[in-house]
Amino acid sequence: MDPVNFIKTYAPRGSIIFINYTMSLTSHLNPSIEKHVGIYYGTLLSEHLVVESTYRKGVQIVPLDSFFEGYLSAKVYMLENIQVMKIAADTSLTLLGIPYGFGHNRMYCFKLVAECYKNAGINTSSKRILGKDIFLSQNFTDDNRWIKIYDSNNLTFWQIDYLKG
């Protein structure tokens, strides 16, 4: 199953979507294993939406299909507590319009996810790089609170059984 249909069918609001693209201007400078992340907001007026932060537009909301344009690989993670995930998804909307960057009052994609989940009561550890605390994909994927429910490079269907309960 492709990631877009998987997310539309199975992913709860607030799921985090890690994605790698075939072409990315920032991927060579990014020490993160997964190069980009967004928060699955859910649906609004029948449109599936993702909140992300990009170097061109800062924090924005985009259609799920657009988020996946030119993707190479994708992974989707969730927490056991769906209510916490909903709070994080709702928080993501309050951050729309913040410019991209690493400084104060700036937001890059991994910081966006960390801030949304911090507001929901889930603190994320950071890595110290060049004297700054930076969030990377590893800060989420190496944290056992996060459950991988989809991996485009390793399609197994136990994830679907887990989601069905």
UniProtKB/Swiss-Prot annotation:
Alphabetic keyword roster: Host cytoplasm, Late protein, Virion
Domain of life: Viruses
InterPro entries, sorted: Papain-like_cys_pep_sf (IPR038765), Peptidase_C92 (IPR024453)
Any one annotated GO CC term: virion component
Compartment(s) where it occurs, according to its Swiss-Prot or TrEMBL record: Virion; Host cytoplasm
Pfam family, one: Peptidase_C92
Family recorded in the similarity comment: Belongs to the orthopoxvirus OPG091 family.
Main function: Contributes to virulence in host but not to replication in cell culture.
Miscellaneous information on this protein: Displays sequence similarity with a group of bacterial permuted NlpC/P60 proteins. Thus, the ancestor of the OPG091 gene might have been acquired from a bacterial source at the onset of poxvirus evolution.
Designated name of the protein: Protein OPG091
Annotated organism of origin: Variola virus (isolate Human/India/Ind3/1967)
Gene behind this protein: OPG091
